[in-house]
Amino acid sequence: MNAKILVIKVGQVETLTFSDGSQYESAIRKKVVPSVKIHSLGAEGNDVGLKKHHGGVDKALFFMSADSFNELNALLXIKIFPYMDTATYGENFVVSGLNEDNVCIGDRYQIGSTILEVSQPRKPCERLSKNTENEETRDIVYQTGLSGWYVRIIETGTIKQKDELKLLARPYPQITIRHLNRLLSTPKNEAELDSALEIEVLAEAFKRSIRSQISKFKQQG
């Protein structure tokens, strides 16, 4: 099955109010659009909250698999969040034909007139739990590795709904998004963590997390 863009979402920072009366500023609830222009730092009309942790060259856009989205819905088992609606996890794109098991770090995809490069998995934060109003959401995403992935922009252009994703390059065919997620949850040994640090295209933010894991190994050893 060819990989395709099923839905595109962009959004601005807004004040969100939750059932417990709490509020915070976030751009997590992105809205569906039919197409979007892509620039060097992301998508036109799109913003992120908590810029210390989101956005930038290595986190320009966030992709999720439709299969993973549906699996998370089943695991959360409280509310159903259709992937064709307003973003639940802050996703910019939901795709078919790709998931954490067949997307690799450094993959380059042509979509419409753009070229994007996979830079790292998404590290789930507490705001996922807050937005779904389910305190287990973050842990479930972390434990299952159904994280989605970030990309950096290689060539700007326009992406439309139903565009196909054409794989142009795969420099690290053994290093899937699932594999990288496992390094942060259940690494086998220090050597495989050291090996990941040698991957040039892996985002520095993710490498910092790997270094933290290495420190834990050294403390245990």
Curated annotation (Swiss-Prot):
**Which cysteines form disulfides?**
none
The chain positions of domain MOSC read 30-168
Q: Which InterPro entries match?
A: Benzoxazolinone_Detox_Enz, MoCF_Sase_C, Pyrv_Knase-like_insert_dom_sf
GO molecular-function terms, A-Z? molybdenum ion binding; oxidoreductase activity; pyridoxal phosphate binding
Which GO cellular component terms are attached? cytosol
Q: Which domain of life is it from?
A: Bacteria
- Could you state one GO biological process linked to this protein? toxin catabolic process
Pfam family, any one: MOSC
Which PANTHER family does this chain map to?
A: PROTEIN YIIM
Protein's recorded name: Uncharacterized protein HI_0278
